Each structure stands twice: as structure tokens, then as C-alpha cells.
């Protein structure tokens, strides 16, 4: 019986990267995993950080029941609060130090952030992993004044994913600024990953360039061509400056 209670939870690369972006949180931190599915991330965090507590929420009652069973298997029942609900509405202001929004579309993440009564419901950090719609998410974060803290690219099952962390807007309204060698206004890739010259970021830039150029072949003289031309120019600039 002790074997099941101490079984280490394995995370796939996307969630492992999300967990890494939470490492700077202090002791006794509270992490809210919004859209937790079966609760693997929350339970893994409890195993790795003995003083942390987690809030695991989802709109699916069957998923939450699986999360409840998993937390019981690792002996984490007393440190996890499982809640049925949608988005950040399950939180009271200030009760979580960090919120996690992984495995959903970027547009959906924007909806959940925008529907909150206050930015991140008082949390100091958000970790986000959009399955798609990353440009829409980054544009929203920039326009709303969120500050990008870190950016990662990870590979899972042959696909590249972007995972980013952000802090809520400053009271003075100051916005993020792009590095001098990164195209201002580029939302398709993360400039933090570019600054570190993260190898998978370069691979992703090449993939996006090929996809953009393929779309341009059928977008000539259409309303979408200028946007695609701009994206192509941004990606070419990133790749040209990579070695500098």
C-alpha cells in the first residue's frame, strides 16, 4: 500500500516545463491549476514541494473525481482543494500565489483572464501553455500590461509547444519592451526564449516561416497577405539575427 502512496508522478514535457516555471515560488505557496483535467500537475507539485498547497479546478466532475483519487494515492488530500467551476471564478482574490492555465487554446486563456474580477485574482504569477492561438494570447498580455517573465519551447509527441510565465500589470501602466534585436510587435515567438537562444525556439521559427510562406502562395492579393508578409519579415529577422 505504501508503494501507491509514494509513487512518483511522471509529467509529460509540456507539464514538466510548466512545473519548472513555478520553481521560484517560495515555501507555503498556493498554486491554482485551472482546467486541471485529472490533476496530475497539481499532485506532482505537491510531491515535489512539501510545503505547497494546490487548488485544482475543472468544469468536468468526472475529471475532478480522478484528481481526487490521485491526490489520495499520494497522500496529498490535506493539501489540495478540488473545485468544480470555470476559470478564475473559482478563486477568491489573493488566495493563490500562482495560477496555471495549460492545455487549452490561447483564445480561451484570454477569455478566462479577461473574465476575472481582477488580474490573476491577486496572484503574482501565471504560467500558460496554449495549444494554439499563441499570437492572440501574447497580444492580449502585451496590450493589457502583463509582463513576460520567462518563455520556453518544448517538444512533445513530435510537436513544439510554447510555455510562458507572466506577472500581472504594473500599477503605473508600464508595458513590456522588446529587446533591440527582436522585432517589436512580434507575438508569434517569445523574446525571452530568443534572448537565451533556446535551440527549439529557432526550430519553431523555421517551422513557422515555412508555414507562413506556404500560406502566402495562396494569399496573394487577398486581405490576409499584408499580415502574412509582416510575419514572414519578423521570422526572417529573428533567424538572421540568431547568431549575433
Locations of regions flagged by a protein language model:
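Class I S-adenosyl-L-methionine
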Residues: 2-20, 89-90, 95, 107-244
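Gly/Ala-rich phosphate-binding loop of Rossmann-like dinucleotide-binding domains
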Residues: 46-47
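Conserved class I S-adenosyl-L-methionine
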Residues: 28-37
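Glycine-rich SAM-binding Motif I of class I
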Residues: 39, 43
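S-adenosyl-L-methionine
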Residues: 65-93
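Conserved SAM/SAH-binding beta-strand->alpha-helix loop
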Residues: 60-62
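Conserved SAM-binding motif I beta-strand of class I
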Residues: 53-58
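Short SAM/SAH-binding signature in class I
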Residues: 96-103
Amino acid at each position: 500500500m505504501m508503494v501507491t502512496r509514494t509513487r512518483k508522478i511522471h509529467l509529460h514535457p509540456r507539464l514538466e516545463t510548466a512545473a519548472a516555471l513555478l520553481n521560484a515560488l517560495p515555501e507555503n505557496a498556493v498554486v491554482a491549476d485551472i482546467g486541471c483535467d485529472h490533476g496530475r500537475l497539481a499532485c506532482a507539485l505537491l510531491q515535489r514541494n512539501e510545503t505547497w498547497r494546490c487548488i485544482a479546478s475543472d468544469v468536468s466532475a468526472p475529471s475532478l473525481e480522478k484528481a481526487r483519487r490521485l491526490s489520495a494515492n499520494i497522500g496529498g488530500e490535506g493539501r489540495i482543494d478540488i473545485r468544480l467551476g470555470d476559470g478564475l471564478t473559482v478563486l477568491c482574490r489573493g488566495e493563490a500565489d500562482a495560477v496555471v492555465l495549460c492545455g487549452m487554446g490561447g483564445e480561451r486563456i484570454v477569455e478566462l483572464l479577461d473574465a476575472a474580477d481582477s488580474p490573476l485574482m491577486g496572484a503574482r504569477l501565471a504560467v500558460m501553455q496554449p495549444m494554439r492561438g499563441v499570437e492572440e494570447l501574447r497580444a492580449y498580455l502585451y496590450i493589457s500590461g502583463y509582463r513576460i517573465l520567462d518563455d520556453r519551447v518544448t517538444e512533445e509527441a513530435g510537436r513544439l509547444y510554447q510555455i510562458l510565465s507572466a506577472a500581472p500589470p504594473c500599477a503605473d501602466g508600464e508595458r513590456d519592451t522588446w529587446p533591440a534585436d527582436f522585432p517589436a510587435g512580434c507575438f508569434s515567438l517569445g523574446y525571452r526564449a530568443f534572448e537565451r537562444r533556446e535551440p527549439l525556439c529557432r526550430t519553431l521559427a523555421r517551422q513557422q516561416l515555412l508555414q507562413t510562406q506556404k500560406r502566402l502562395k495562396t494569399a496573394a492579393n487577398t486581405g490576409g497577405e499584408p499580415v502574412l508578409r509582416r510575419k514572414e519579415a519578423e521570422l526572417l529577422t529573428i533567424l538572421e539575427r540568431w547568431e549575433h
